[in-house]
Curated annotation (Swiss-Prot):
The gene is UGT74CD1. The active site is at H21, D114. This is UDP-glucosyl transferase 74CD1. It is an enzyme of class 2 (transferase). Its EC number is 2.4.1.-. It comes from Saponaria officinalis. Component of the oleanane-type triterpene saponins (e.g. saponarioside A and saponarioside B) biosynthetic pathway, leading to the production of natural products with detergent properties used as traditional sources of soap.
Amino acid sequence: MSDQNDKKVEIIVFPYHGQGHMNTMLQFAKRIAWKNAKVTIATTLSTTNKMKSKVENAWGTSITLDSIYDDSDESQIKFMDRMARFEAAAASSLSKLLVQKKEEADNKVLLVYDGNLPWALDIAHEHGVRGAAFFPQSCATVATYYSLYQETQGKELETELPAVFPPLELIQRNVPNVFGLKFPEAVVAKNGKEYSPFVLFVLRQCINLEKADLLLFNQFDKLVEPGEVLQWMSKIFNVKTIGPTLPSSYIDKRIKDDVDYGFHAFNLDNNSCINWLNSKPARSVIYIAFGSSVHYSVEQMTEIAEALKSQPNNFLWAVRETEQKKLPEDFVQQTSEKGLMLSWCPQLDVLVHESISCFVTHCGWNSITEALSFGVPMLSVPQFLDQPVDAHFVEQVWGAGITVKRSEDGLVTRDEIVRCLEVLNNGEKAEEIKANVARWKVLAKEALDEGGSSDKHIDEIIEWVSSF
């Protein structure tokens, strides 16, 4: 534990129940608890059952879990119906929890809610509790979402986004059938323009954003400062960076026994993956992972497979079993000498491994954060929403990788993938990128070290709550 004086404060952490959301907010909870504030994680019954014994055995009463929603019978419920049901039931339970914690902590309570659950802020304010929106996306993405949300409402921004930002239209391209959902092509917003209904659903997180008492981002100051992103956001909101929210053993090593995220929705095959990497030379393996929500066509999977087959490097590909069925016949057998394909693997352990040369990623924010923190160059293959925005920053602002160019029909061809891998692994550009990511690795650790920007911001949050 930190040597900071005990504070009689209660931080209620309320994540959305996806793995990426849960992991980052749990790491934030650990940092808060390590500094001797009390944390309650309000989550679903299934998540509580998975995590409760492990978390509470490690943290005692510093971190407790409170189940506020029974999701045990949801397997056959459609996504939108499930979200509506979750909001209705969890809202009532969250309200009761806030009342209870206010009494126990003498009003020194803060609700840290997932930015994708904006209704939680309204409930907090109804009970006189301050609310901090915690975003699983980058600061640049939320700035873009906010700007686009204002546009859909027919409002103009007082200050335009800095020039470094890509056009707002970028996040509306290539919106796929996410999680197998099908959306109508377009709906009309208040400003009379047509938008993807999935985009409008995502933009709901901005509906009461200006009322939030604090905005928290899984980044660090040095990463947000280029392009004046932090400066622009700070003109509108109270913003603090508190990242990277990684297990301490992988970065600053200040928190004893903090060795993993603590929540996994998948069964991870650690041994075969790491043993295979151990057998490979340093910087000889391309790691490919596109997250849990990306679904590619058979044609696109074939292009990726043929690119990996024709390029000379070893590769490790984490690809879900449903996606493996789209691969060319005998691909695994034909590439067995240089490739390993698993349905999932321990990404933190993979990215810190000395055999990894680069990371082919869909540009989910957690993946980018991990790659930057571990100094791994990236080949960005973004699809939709925040991914193109973050890919733009990876290449154009942070100099940490390159982005594939798509054909006119949206396909990433095998030749393009091979070309990008060659640029990323060999030559002057590769050396420039390696130097940049090495710098970001150092800065990420410095942010969490004692007195670093994120470390200080977490202290300031606790002091702020103790002043209520």
